Amino acid sequence: MQLNSTEISDLIKQRIESFNVVSEARNEGTIVSVSDGIIRIHGLADVMQGEMIELPGNRYALALNLERDSVGAVVMGPYADLREGMKVTGTGRILEVPVGPELLGRVVNTLGEPIDGKGPIGAKQTSPVEVIAPGVIDRKSVDQPVQTGYKSVDSMIPIGRGQRELIIGDRQTGKTALAIDAIINQKNSGIYSIYVAIGQKASTIANVVRKLEEHGALKNTIVVVASASESAALQYLAPYSGCAMGEYFRDRGEDALIVYDDLSKQAVAYRQISLLLRRPPGREAFPGDVFYLHSRLLERAARVNEEYVERFTKGEVKGKTGSLTALPIIETQAGDVSAFVPTNVISITDGQIFLQTELFNAGVRPAVDPGISVSRVGGAAQTKIVKKLSGGIRTALAAYRELAAFAQFSSDLDEATKRQLTHGQKVTELMKQKQYAPMSVFDQALVIFAAERGYLTDVELNKVLDFEAALLSYARAHYAELAAQIDKTGAYNDEIEAQLKKLVDDFKATQTW
Protein backbone atom coordinates (compact mmCIF):
# COMPACT_ATOMS: atom_id res chain seq x y z
CA MET A 1 0.00 0.00 0.00
CA GLN A 2 1.49 3.27 -1.12
CA LEU A 3 0.49 6.63 0.31
CA ASN A 4 1.32 9.84 -1.45
CA SER A 5 2.30 13.00 0.38
CA THR A 6 -1.12 14.67 -0.13
CA GLU A 7 -2.95 11.79 1.58
CA ILE A 8 -0.48 11.82 4.46
CA SER A 9 -0.85 15.57 4.91
CA ASP A 10 -4.71 15.28 4.78
CA LEU A 11 -4.60 12.50 7.38
CA ILE A 12 -2.40 14.57 9.68
CA LYS A 13 -4.72 17.60 9.26
CA GLN A 14 -7.75 15.39 10.07
CA ARG A 15 -6.05 14.07 13.19
CA ILE A 16 -5.11 17.59 14.29
CA GLU A 17 -8.70 18.81 13.79
CA SER A 18 -10.18 15.93 15.77
CA PHE A 19 -7.58 16.24 18.55
CA ASN A 20 -9.31 17.67 21.57
CA VAL A 21 -7.28 18.83 24.55
CA VAL A 22 -8.97 20.76 27.33
CA SER A 23 -6.79 22.88 29.53
CA GLU A 24 -8.35 24.25 32.67
CA ALA A 25 -6.64 26.98 34.63
CA ARG A 26 -7.66 26.88 38.27
CA ASN A 27 -6.60 29.07 41.11
CA GLU A 28 -4.62 27.34 43.81
CA GLY A 29 -4.03 28.43 47.39
CA THR A 30 -2.43 27.15 50.57
CA ILE A 31 -4.07 26.75 53.98
CA VAL A 32 -2.21 28.93 56.52
CA SER A 33 -4.44 28.29 59.57
CA VAL A 34 -7.33 26.06 60.68
CA SER A 35 -9.44 26.81 63.76
CA ASP A 36 -13.07 26.13 64.74
CA GLY A 37 -14.13 25.28 61.20
CA ILE A 38 -12.61 28.46 59.76
CA ILE A 39 -9.64 28.21 57.40
CA ARG A 40 -7.38 31.03 56.23
CA ILE A 41 -5.97 30.58 52.75
CA HIS A 42 -3.00 32.33 51.14
CA GLY A 43 -3.28 32.74 47.36
CA LEU A 44 -6.63 32.38 45.53
CA ALA A 45 -6.28 35.96 44.25
CA ASP A 46 -9.44 36.01 42.11
CA VAL A 47 -11.84 34.08 44.34
CA MET A 48 -15.46 35.38 44.50
CA GLN A 49 -17.54 36.14 47.58
CA GLY A 50 -19.49 32.95 48.37
CA GLU A 51 -17.38 30.80 45.99
CA MET A 52 -16.95 27.08 46.67
CA ILE A 53 -13.33 26.18 47.46
CA GLU A 54 -12.38 22.55 46.89
CA LEU A 55 -10.51 20.94 49.80
CA PRO A 56 -8.68 17.60 49.96
CA GLY A 57 -11.03 14.63 50.57
CA ASN A 58 -13.96 15.77 48.36
CA ARG A 59 -15.01 18.55 50.74
CA TYR A 60 -15.78 22.19 50.17
CA ALA A 61 -15.40 25.48 52.00
CA LEU A 62 -17.33 28.70 51.40
CA ALA A 63 -15.30 31.91 50.87
CA LEU A 64 -16.79 34.59 53.14
CA ASN A 65 -13.94 37.00 53.99
CA LEU A 66 -11.90 38.41 51.09
CA GLU A 67 -8.91 40.22 52.62
CA ARG A 68 -5.83 41.86 51.11
CA ASP A 69 -3.48 38.86 51.38
CA SER A 70 -5.70 35.99 52.53
CA VAL A 71 -9.17 34.48 52.22
CA GLY A 72 -11.30 33.46 55.23
CA ALA A 73 -13.51 30.45 54.43
CA VAL A 74 -15.88 28.30 56.45
CA VAL A 75 -15.60 24.52 56.03
CA MET A 76 -18.80 22.62 55.22
CA GLY A 77 -18.21 19.32 56.94
CA PRO A 78 -15.48 17.81 59.16
CA TYR A 79 -12.25 19.81 59.44
CA ALA A 80 -10.18 17.92 62.08
CA ASP A 81 -7.77 16.46 59.48
CA LEU A 82 -7.09 19.73 57.63
CA ARG A 83 -3.51 20.95 58.13
CA GLU A 84 -1.46 24.06 57.45
CA GLY A 85 0.27 23.82 54.06
CA MET A 86 -2.46 21.76 52.33
CA LYS A 87 -3.32 22.87 48.79
CA VAL A 88 -6.87 24.03 47.95
CA THR A 89 -8.40 25.15 44.63
CA GLY A 90 -11.08 27.64 43.64
CA THR A 91 -13.98 26.16 41.66
CA GLY A 92 -15.22 29.36 40.02
CA ARG A 93 -18.83 28.62 41.00
CA ILE A 94 -21.07 29.41 43.94
CA LEU A 95 -23.00 26.84 45.99
CA GLU A 96 -25.83 25.11 44.12
CA VAL A 97 -28.41 22.63 45.39
CA PRO A 98 -30.61 20.13 43.51
CA VAL A 99 -34.16 21.39 42.84
CA GLY A 100 -37.32 19.99 41.27
CA PRO A 101 -40.33 17.75 41.94
CA GLU A 102 -38.00 14.76 42.59
CA LEU A 103 -37.29 16.21 46.06
CA LEU A 104 -40.96 16.07 47.15
CA GLY A 105 -41.51 13.54 49.92
CA ARG A 106 -37.82 13.49 50.82
CA VAL A 107 -35.69 14.62 53.78
CA VAL A 108 -32.43 16.28 52.68
CA ASN A 109 -29.54 18.14 54.29
CA THR A 110 -28.44 21.71 53.50
CA LEU A 111 -26.59 20.56 50.36
CA GLY A 112 -29.67 18.68 49.06
CA GLU A 113 -28.24 15.23 49.82
CA PRO A 114 -30.82 12.66 51.00
CA ILE A 115 -30.66 11.68 54.69
CA ASP A 116 -33.85 9.61 54.89
CA GLY A 117 -32.37 6.31 53.70
CA LYS A 118 -34.67 6.12 50.64
CA GLY A 119 -31.89 6.08 48.07
CA PRO A 120 -30.63 8.75 45.65
CA ILE A 121 -32.95 11.55 44.53
CA GLY A 122 -32.01 11.92 40.86
CA ALA A 123 -32.93 15.59 40.52
CA LYS A 124 -32.43 16.84 36.96
CA GLN A 125 -31.63 20.46 37.83
CA THR A 126 -29.63 22.51 40.31
CA SER A 127 -30.03 26.12 41.39
CA PRO A 128 -27.74 28.60 43.19
CA VAL A 129 -28.65 29.08 46.85
CA GLU A 130 -28.16 32.86 46.61
CA VAL A 131 -30.44 34.48 44.02
CA ILE A 132 -31.51 38.10 43.68
CA ALA A 133 -35.22 38.49 44.55
CA PRO A 134 -37.73 39.43 41.79
CA GLY A 135 -38.01 43.17 41.19
CA VAL A 136 -41.09 45.36 41.69
CA ILE A 137 -42.15 45.09 38.03
CA ASP A 138 -42.11 41.27 38.17
CA ARG A 139 -44.44 41.08 41.17
CA LYS A 140 -48.21 40.85 41.46
CA SER A 141 -50.30 41.88 44.45
CA VAL A 142 -51.38 39.19 46.90
CA ASP A 143 -55.04 38.19 46.37
CA GLN A 144 -55.29 34.39 46.78
CA PRO A 145 -55.54 32.76 50.20
CA VAL A 146 -53.34 30.23 51.96
CA GLN A 147 -55.71 28.41 54.32
CA THR A 148 -53.93 27.37 57.53
CA GLY A 149 -57.01 25.49 58.79
CA TYR A 150 -56.99 27.49 62.03
CA LYS A 151 -60.15 29.52 62.75
CA SER A 152 -58.27 32.19 64.69
CA VAL A 153 -55.65 32.71 61.95
CA ASP A 154 -57.86 32.46 58.84
CA SER A 155 -60.52 34.77 60.31
CA MET A 156 -58.39 37.43 62.05
CA ILE A 157 -54.88 37.20 60.53
CA PRO A 158 -55.41 35.85 56.99
CA ILE A 159 -52.37 34.83 54.94
CA GLY A 160 -52.17 35.27 51.16
CA ARG A 161 -50.06 33.48 48.54
CA GLY A 162 -46.76 35.32 48.23
CA GLN A 163 -46.97 36.89 51.69
CA ARG A 164 -44.34 36.74 54.47
CA GLU A 165 -46.09 36.18 57.81
CA LEU A 166 -43.94 35.93 60.92
CA ILE A 167 -44.82 33.45 63.69
CA ILE A 168 -43.28 34.82 66.88
CA GLY A 169 -43.41 33.75 70.52
CA ASP A 170 -41.50 32.28 73.44
CA ARG A 171 -40.37 28.66 73.51
CA GLN A 172 -43.15 26.11 74.00
CA THR A 173 -46.00 28.31 72.77
CA GLY A 174 -46.99 26.22 69.73
CA LYS A 175 -45.08 27.98 66.92
CA THR A 176 -43.97 24.80 65.15
CA ALA A 177 -47.39 23.19 65.72
CA LEU A 178 -49.06 26.11 63.90
CA ALA A 179 -46.64 25.88 60.96
CA ILE A 180 -46.89 22.07 60.69
CA ASP A 181 -50.71 22.25 60.71
CA ALA A 182 -50.53 24.86 57.93
CA ILE A 183 -48.41 22.40 55.89
CA ILE A 184 -50.81 19.51 56.63
CA ASN A 185 -53.73 21.67 55.45
CA GLN A 186 -52.05 22.11 52.03
CA LYS A 187 -52.05 18.39 51.16
CA ASN A 188 -54.99 18.80 48.73
CA SER A 189 -54.68 22.53 47.96
CA GLY A 190 -52.07 22.28 45.18
CA ILE A 191 -49.53 24.21 47.25
CA TYR A 192 -46.15 22.50 47.66
CA SER A 193 -44.49 22.88 51.06
CA ILE A 194 -40.88 23.16 52.22
CA TYR A 195 -40.05 22.78 55.91
CA VAL A 196 -36.58 24.02 56.90
CA ALA A 197 -35.46 22.84 60.35
CA ILE A 198 -32.54 24.89 61.69
CA GLY A 199 -30.63 23.95 64.85
CA GLN A 200 -33.29 21.58 66.20
CA LYS A 201 -32.86 18.22 67.92
CA ALA A 202 -32.82 15.30 65.47
CA SER A 203 -35.56 13.58 67.52
CA THR A 204 -37.86 16.62 67.15
CA ILE A 205 -37.33 16.68 63.37
CA ALA A 206 -37.98 12.91 63.12
CA ASN A 207 -41.25 13.44 65.00
CA VAL A 208 -42.30 16.22 62.58
CA VAL A 209 -41.51 14.02 59.54
CA ARG A 210 -43.53 11.16 61.07
CA LYS A 211 -46.54 13.44 61.68
CA LEU A 212 -46.41 14.77 58.10
CA GLU A 213 -46.33 11.19 56.82
CA GLU A 214 -49.21 10.10 59.08
CA HIS A 215 -51.42 12.92 57.77
CA GLY A 216 -50.53 12.33 54.11
CA ALA A 217 -48.73 15.66 53.68
CA LEU A 218 -45.14 14.42 53.23
CA LYS A 219 -45.68 13.52 49.55
CA ASN A 220 -46.06 17.26 48.75
CA THR A 221 -43.35 18.43 51.15
CA ILE A 222 -39.56 18.80 51.09
CA VAL A 223 -37.90 18.70 54.52
CA VAL A 224 -34.50 20.45 54.71
CA VAL A 225 -32.56 19.64 57.87
CA ALA A 226 -29.61 21.39 59.53
CA SER A 227 -29.87 19.88 63.01
CA ALA A 228 -28.20 21.12 66.20
CA SER A 229 -25.29 18.72 65.61
CA GLU A 230 -24.46 20.21 62.18
CA SER A 231 -21.83 22.91 61.72
CA ALA A 232 -22.77 26.60 62.00
CA ALA A 233 -22.09 26.99 58.26
CA LEU A 234 -24.76 24.44 57.33
CA GLN A 235 -27.27 25.98 59.79
CA TYR A 236 -26.60 29.41 58.25
CA LEU A 237 -27.08 28.14 54.68
CA ALA A 238 -30.12 25.86 55.23
CA PRO A 239 -32.83 28.57 54.74
CA TYR A 240 -31.25 29.68 51.44
CA SER A 241 -31.16 26.06 50.20
CA GLY A 242 -34.84 25.57 51.11
CA CYS A 243 -35.72 28.86 49.43
CA ALA A 244 -33.98 27.81 46.18
CA MET A 245 -36.07 24.60 46.21
CA GLY A 246 -39.26 26.66 46.72
CA GLU A 247 -38.34 29.12 43.96
CA TYR A 248 -38.28 26.24 41.47
CA PHE A 249 -42.08 25.97 41.86
CA ARG A 250 -42.67 29.75 42.09
CA ASP A 251 -40.82 30.47 38.84
CA ARG A 252 -42.82 27.82 36.93
CA GLY A 253 -46.27 29.20 37.80
CA GLU A 254 -46.87 26.95 40.82
CA ASP A 255 -47.56 27.89 44.46
CA ALA A 256 -45.26 26.94 47.34
CA LEU A 257 -45.18 27.51 51.10
CA ILE A 258 -41.91 27.59 53.04
CA VAL A 259 -41.50 27.43 56.82
CA TYR A 260 -38.20 28.53 58.41
CA ASP A 261 -38.04 26.95 61.86
CA ASP A 262 -36.43 29.05 63.18
CA LEU A 263 -34.51 32.13 62.02
CA SER A 264 -33.30 32.98 65.56
CA LYS A 265 -31.04 29.91 65.43
CA GLN A 266 -29.85 30.85 61.95
CA ALA A 267 -28.90 34.33 63.22
CA VAL A 268 -26.98 32.75 66.13
CA ALA A 269 -25.12 30.44 63.68
CA TYR A 270 -24.26 33.45 61.49
CA ARG A 271 -23.08 35.39 64.56
CA GLN A 272 -20.81 32.47 65.45
CA ILE A 273 -19.29 32.39 61.94
CA SER A 274 -18.86 36.19 61.87
CA LEU A 275 -17.11 36.32 65.25
CA LEU A 276 -14.78 33.46 64.23
CA LEU A 277 -13.99 35.39 61.03
CA ARG A 278 -13.09 38.36 63.29
CA ARG A 279 -15.80 40.63 61.89
CA PRO A 280 -16.61 43.55 64.23
CA PRO A 281 -19.59 42.76 66.50
CA GLY A 282 -22.51 45.15 66.97
CA ARG A 283 -25.71 45.06 69.05
CA GLU A 284 -26.07 41.79 71.03
CA ALA A 285 -22.71 40.78 69.41
CA PHE A 286 -24.47 40.26 66.04
CA PRO A 287 -22.56 41.45 62.94
CA GLY A 288 -23.65 44.60 61.14
CA ASP A 289 -25.28 42.74 58.24
CA VAL A 290 -27.68 40.53 60.23
CA PHE A 291 -30.62 42.57 58.86
CA TYR A 292 -29.45 41.84 55.30
CA LEU A 293 -29.08 38.16 56.25
CA HIS A 294 -32.86 37.92 56.74
CA SER A 295 -34.08 40.58 54.28
CA ARG A 296 -32.41 38.99 51.25
CA LEU A 297 -33.92 35.64 52.24
CA LEU A 298 -37.48 36.84 52.90
CA GLU A 299 -37.63 39.15 49.85
CA ARG A 300 -37.42 36.01 47.69
CA ALA A 301 -40.89 35.03 48.93
CA ALA A 302 -43.19 36.80 46.47
CA ARG A 303 -46.05 36.45 44.04
CA VAL A 304 -44.72 36.83 40.51
CA ASN A 305 -46.81 37.87 37.51
CA GLU A 306 -47.63 35.99 34.29
CA GLU A 307 -44.96 37.82 32.26
CA TYR A 308 -42.22 36.78 34.70
CA VAL A 309 -43.28 33.10 34.60
CA GLU A 310 -43.58 33.14 30.80
CA ARG A 311 -40.15 34.78 30.43
CA PHE A 312 -38.53 32.39 32.93
CA THR A 313 -39.98 29.25 31.29
CA LYS A 314 -39.25 30.62 27.77
CA GLY A 315 -42.95 30.52 26.87
CA GLU A 316 -43.64 26.98 28.11
CA VAL A 317 -45.98 28.21 30.88
CA LYS A 318 -48.44 30.94 29.87
CA GLY A 319 -51.05 32.87 31.86
CA LYS A 320 -50.05 31.54 35.30
CA THR A 321 -48.73 33.43 38.29
CA GLY A 322 -46.35 31.77 40.73
CA SER A 323 -45.94 32.34 44.45
CA LEU A 324 -43.68 31.49 47.36
CA THR A 325 -45.28 32.16 50.76
CA ALA A 326 -42.93 32.33 53.75
CA LEU A 327 -43.74 31.57 57.39
CA PRO A 328 -40.55 32.48 59.27
CA ILE A 329 -40.49 31.57 62.97
CA ILE A 330 -38.70 33.65 65.62
CA GLU A 331 -38.25 32.61 69.24
CA THR A 332 -38.37 35.43 71.79
CA GLN A 333 -36.91 35.49 75.31
CA ALA A 334 -39.56 36.20 77.97
CA GLY A 335 -41.86 37.89 75.43
CA ASP A 336 -39.27 40.51 74.45
CA VAL A 337 -40.20 41.45 70.88
CA SER A 338 -37.96 44.54 71.03
CA ALA A 339 -34.74 42.48 70.84
CA PHE A 340 -32.53 42.90 67.77
CA VAL A 341 -33.51 39.92 65.58
CA PRO A 342 -37.30 40.02 66.37
CA THR A 343 -37.54 43.75 65.48
CA ASN A 344 -35.57 43.17 62.27
CA VAL A 345 -37.81 40.35 61.08
CA ILE A 346 -41.03 42.16 62.14
CA SER A 347 -39.96 45.11 59.96
CA ILE A 348 -39.20 42.83 56.97
CA THR A 349 -42.37 40.70 57.04
CA ASP A 350 -45.97 41.55 56.03
CA GLY A 351 -47.39 40.91 59.49
CA GLN A 352 -46.93 38.69 62.52
CA ILE A 353 -48.81 36.06 64.50
CA PHE A 354 -47.85 36.62 68.13
CA LEU A 355 -48.20 33.59 70.41
CA GLN A 356 -48.38 34.26 74.15
CA THR A 357 -47.21 32.01 76.99
CA GLU A 358 -50.03 33.19 79.30
CA LEU A 359 -52.72 32.24 76.77
CA PHE A 360 -51.02 28.90 76.06
CA ASN A 361 -50.87 28.05 79.77
CA ALA A 362 -54.52 29.11 80.17
CA GLY A 363 -55.49 26.46 77.60
CA VAL A 364 -56.16 28.86 74.71
CA ARG A 365 -54.53 27.00 71.84
CA PRO A 366 -53.43 28.19 69.34
CA ALA A 367 -52.26 30.91 71.77
CA VAL A 368 -52.73 33.76 69.26
CA ASP A 369 -52.85 37.24 70.79
CA PRO A 370 -55.37 39.06 68.54
CA GLY A 371 -54.38 42.45 69.97
CA ILE A 372 -50.87 42.62 68.50
CA SER A 373 -51.11 40.01 65.73
CA VAL A 374 -51.69 41.52 62.30
CA SER A 375 -51.67 40.66 58.60
CA ARG A 376 -50.79 43.67 56.47
CA VAL A 377 -51.67 42.29 53.03
CA GLY A 378 -53.72 39.14 53.70
CA GLY A 379 -57.10 40.93 53.90
CA ALA A 380 -57.26 41.14 50.10
CA ALA A 381 -56.64 37.39 49.87
CA GLN A 382 -59.15 36.27 52.49
CA THR A 383 -61.95 33.91 51.41
CA LYS A 384 -65.05 36.05 50.76
CA ILE A 385 -67.37 34.19 53.14
CA VAL A 386 -64.91 34.20 56.06
CA LYS A 387 -64.09 37.88 55.45
CA LYS A 388 -67.77 38.89 55.49
CA LEU A 389 -68.56 36.91 58.63
CA SER A 390 -65.47 37.42 60.77
CA GLY A 391 -65.48 41.22 60.97
CA GLY A 392 -66.78 41.26 64.54
CA ILE A 393 -64.56 38.48 65.92
CA ARG A 394 -61.41 40.56 66.45
CA THR A 395 -63.47 43.48 67.84
CA ALA A 396 -65.30 41.16 70.26
CA LEU A 397 -62.02 39.68 71.51
CA ALA A 398 -60.28 43.06 71.83
CA ALA A 399 -63.26 44.52 73.75
CA TYR A 400 -63.38 41.41 75.95
CA ARG A 401 -59.67 41.68 76.87
CA GLU A 402 -60.11 45.35 77.75
CA LEU A 403 -63.26 44.76 79.81
CA ALA A 404 -61.85 41.65 81.52
CA ALA A 405 -58.95 43.71 82.88
CA PHE A 406 -61.37 46.46 83.96
CA ALA A 407 -63.90 44.03 85.49
CA GLN A 408 -61.33 42.76 88.01
CA PHE A 409 -61.66 46.06 89.88
CA SER A 410 -65.43 46.35 89.75
CA SER A 411 -68.09 43.99 91.12
CA ASP A 412 -71.29 45.73 89.99
CA LEU A 413 -71.32 45.62 86.20
CA ASP A 414 -74.25 46.74 84.03
CA GLU A 415 -76.06 44.25 81.81
CA ALA A 416 -74.47 45.42 78.54
CA THR A 417 -70.95 44.95 79.95
CA LYS A 418 -71.86 41.51 81.34
CA ARG A 419 -73.22 40.50 77.94
CA GLN A 420 -70.05 41.69 76.22
CA LEU A 421 -67.86 39.81 78.71
CA THR A 422 -69.85 36.59 78.29
CA HIS A 423 -69.79 36.90 74.48
CA GLY A 424 -66.01 37.51 74.57
CA GLN A 425 -65.47 34.45 76.76
CA LYS A 426 -67.52 32.29 74.39
CA VAL A 427 -65.69 33.58 71.29
CA THR A 428 -62.34 32.92 73.02
CA GLU A 429 -63.55 29.39 73.78
CA LEU A 430 -64.71 28.96 70.19
CA MET A 431 -61.31 29.98 68.79
CA LYS A 432 -59.66 27.02 70.56
CA GLN A 433 -58.65 24.19 68.27
CA LYS A 434 -56.85 20.88 68.64
CA GLN A 435 -53.54 20.19 66.91
CA TYR A 436 -53.59 18.20 63.63
CA ALA A 437 -57.29 19.07 63.15
CA PRO A 438 -57.35 21.77 60.44
CA MET A 439 -60.82 23.04 59.49
CA SER A 440 -62.27 23.54 56.02
CA VAL A 441 -63.61 26.93 54.84
CA PHE A 442 -67.19 25.75 55.36
CA ASP A 443 -66.50 24.55 58.94
CA GLN A 444 -64.87 27.88 59.83
CA ALA A 445 -67.63 29.94 58.19
CA LEU A 446 -70.38 27.98 59.96
CA VAL A 447 -68.80 28.31 63.41
CA ILE A 448 -68.13 32.04 62.96
CA PHE A 449 -71.69 32.53 61.64
CA ALA A 450 -73.10 30.90 64.80
CA ALA A 451 -70.98 33.19 67.01
CA GLU A 452 -71.70 36.38 65.06
CA ARG A 453 -75.47 35.86 64.80
CA GLY A 454 -75.91 35.32 68.55
CA TYR A 455 -76.58 31.57 68.48
CA LEU A 456 -74.23 31.05 71.44
CA THR A 457 -76.24 33.27 73.82
CA ASP A 458 -78.09 30.37 75.44
CA VAL A 459 -75.13 27.92 75.28
CA GLU A 460 -73.23 27.42 78.54
CA LEU A 461 -69.54 28.43 78.41
CA ASN A 462 -68.34 24.89 79.20
CA LYS A 463 -70.58 23.52 76.41
CA VAL A 464 -69.31 25.80 73.61
CA LEU A 465 -66.83 23.27 72.16
CA ASP A 466 -69.41 20.45 72.43
CA PHE A 467 -71.89 22.72 70.62
CA GLU A 468 -69.31 23.35 67.87
CA ALA A 469 -68.50 19.64 67.39
CA ALA A 470 -72.19 18.65 67.29
CA LEU A 471 -73.03 21.51 64.87
CA LEU A 472 -70.27 20.47 62.46
CA SER A 473 -71.22 16.78 62.46
CA TYR A 474 -74.92 17.73 61.93
CA ALA A 475 -73.95 20.01 59.01
CA ARG A 476 -71.83 17.30 57.37
CA ALA A 477 -74.66 14.79 57.70
CA HIS A 478 -77.55 17.00 56.50
CA TYR A 479 -75.99 19.82 54.45
CA ALA A 480 -73.14 18.11 52.55
CA GLU A 481 -74.05 19.88 49.29
CA LEU A 482 -73.85 23.36 50.87
CA ALA A 483 -70.53 22.41 52.51
CA ALA A 484 -69.06 21.28 49.17
CA GLN A 485 -70.28 24.48 47.45
CA ILE A 486 -68.74 26.80 50.08
CA ASP A 487 -65.47 24.84 50.21
CA LYS A 488 -65.17 25.10 46.42
CA THR A 489 -66.14 28.75 45.82
CA GLY A 490 -65.91 30.50 49.21
CA ALA A 491 -68.71 32.78 47.97
CA TYR A 492 -71.22 34.54 50.23
CA ASN A 493 -74.63 35.95 49.29
CA ASP A 494 -78.18 36.27 50.68
CA GLU A 495 -79.07 32.75 49.56
CA ILE A 496 -76.08 31.19 51.34
CA GLU A 497 -76.80 33.30 54.44
CA ALA A 498 -80.40 32.00 54.46
CA GLN A 499 -79.17 28.41 54.14
CA LEU A 500 -76.67 28.85 56.99
CA LYS A 501 -79.41 30.39 59.15
CA LYS A 502 -81.74 27.47 58.40
CA LEU A 503 -78.93 24.99 59.15
CA VAL A 504 -78.17 26.48 62.60
CA ASP A 505 -81.89 26.90 63.42
CA ASP A 506 -82.56 23.25 62.50
CA PHE A 507 -79.61 22.12 64.60
CA LYS A 508 -80.61 24.19 67.64
CA ALA A 509 -84.10 22.70 67.45
CA THR A 510 -82.55 19.23 67.99
CA GLN A 511 -80.90 20.29 71.32
CA THR A 512 -78.26 17.56 70.85
CA TRP A 513 -75.09 19.05 72.26
From Swiss-Prot:
GO biological process: proton motive force-driven ATP synthesis
Pfam families reported for this sequence: ATP-synt_ab, ATP-synt_ab_C, ATP-synt_ab_N
Catalytic activity: ATP + H2O + 4 H(+)(in) = ADP + phosphate + 5 H(+)(out)
Site keyed Required for activity: positions: S373
Molecular function per GO: ADP binding; ATP binding; proton-transporting ATP synthase activity, rotational mechanism
Main location as per UniProt: membrane
Binding-site residues, ATP: G169, D170, R171, Q172, T173, G174, K175, T176
Annotated membrane topology: Peripheral membrane protein
Keywords from the UniProt entry: ATP synthesis, ATP-binding, Cell inner membrane, Cell membrane, CF(1), Hydrogen ion transport, Ion transport, Membrane, Nucleotide-binding, Translocase, Transport
GO cellular component: plasma membrane; proton-transporting ATP synthase complex
Annotated localization: Cell inner membrane
CDD domains the UniProt entry points to: ATP-synt_F1_alpha_C, ATP-synt_F1_alpha_N, F1-ATPase_alpha_CD
Known EC number: 7.1.2.2
Keyword Cell inner membrane: yes
InterPro entries noted in UniProt: ATP_synth_asu-like_sf, ATP_synth_asu_C, ATP_synth_asu_C_sf, ATP_synth_F1_a_nt-bd_dom, ATP_synth_F1_asu, ATPase_a/bsu_AS, ATPase_F1/V1/A1_a/bsu_N, ATPase_F1/V1/A1_a/bsu_N_sf
Presence of keyword Cell inner membrane: yes
Annotated function: Produces ATP from ADP in the presence of a proton gradient across the membrane. The alpha chain is a regulatory subunit.
Subunit structure: F-type ATPases have 2 components, CF(1) - the catalytic core - and CF(0) - the membrane proton channel. CF(1) has five subunits: alpha(3), beta(3), gamma(1), delta(1), epsilon(1). CF(0) has three main subunits: a(1), b(2) and c(9-12). The alpha and beta chains form an alternating ring which encloses part of the gamma chain. CF(1) is attached to CF(0) by a central stalk formed by the gamma and epsilon chains, while a peripheral stalk is formed by the delta and b chains.
Family: Belongs to the ATPase alpha/beta chains family.
Name this polypeptide is given: ATP synthase subunit alpha
Native source organism of the sequence: Vibrio cholerae serotype O1 (strain ATCC 39315 / El Tor Inaba N16961)
Gene assigned in the entry: atpA
